[in-house]
Amino acid sequence: MIALDTNVLVRCLTLDDPTQVPAARRALGHTAGFFVAKTVLLETEWVLRAAYKLPRTSIHAALSGVCGLPNAYLEHEGQMAQALADYAAGMDFADALHVAASWADEGLHTFDRRLVKAAQERGRDVRLMSSLA
């Protein structure tokens, strides 16, 4: 199995570099499989959104497609699946990953009101912290 960096995923998803795309495609077809870390998926979403200006629906489809390949091995697969579902429902992807990775008994605590609202709409345990002592 090989582990892939963000730029390999971006090459496959954007087809933006004709000299690197064939090698990137071969990597995704690696017979022993390929590993994708949460941080790689997080950075890939950011690159597709910030640098390529792709819409959320296209980014979600692209990330889901890569994660759904039969030879893909994902770091904390369940967390990534939850984060992708929450992202599709409107949550920020980084926030969705933070929430998915938070297995605290009393939820994720934040000062971010938008995160609390979006997460609670999805039934996630995210709580607003008070800045008052």
Question: Where would I find each of the regions flagged by the language model?
Answer:
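Short, amphipathic alpha-helical segments that act as regulatory/interfacial helices
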Residues: 45-48, 103
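Short, well-structured N-terminal submotif of metal-dependent ribonuclease cores
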Residues: 1-36, 51-61, 122-133
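Acidic catalytic patch
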Residues: 38, 42, 60-88
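A generic local structural motif
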Residues: 20-22, 94-97
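Short beta-strand scaffold positions
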Residues: 4, 36, 74-75, 93, ...
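Alpha-helix C-terminal capping segments
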Residues: 25-31, 83, 87, 98-105
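Acidic, PIN/NYN-like endoribonuclease modules and their adjacent C-terminal/linker elements
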Residues: 1, 69, 100, 104-133
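Alpha-helix capping/helix-boundary segments
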Residues: 8, 40, 79, 98, ...
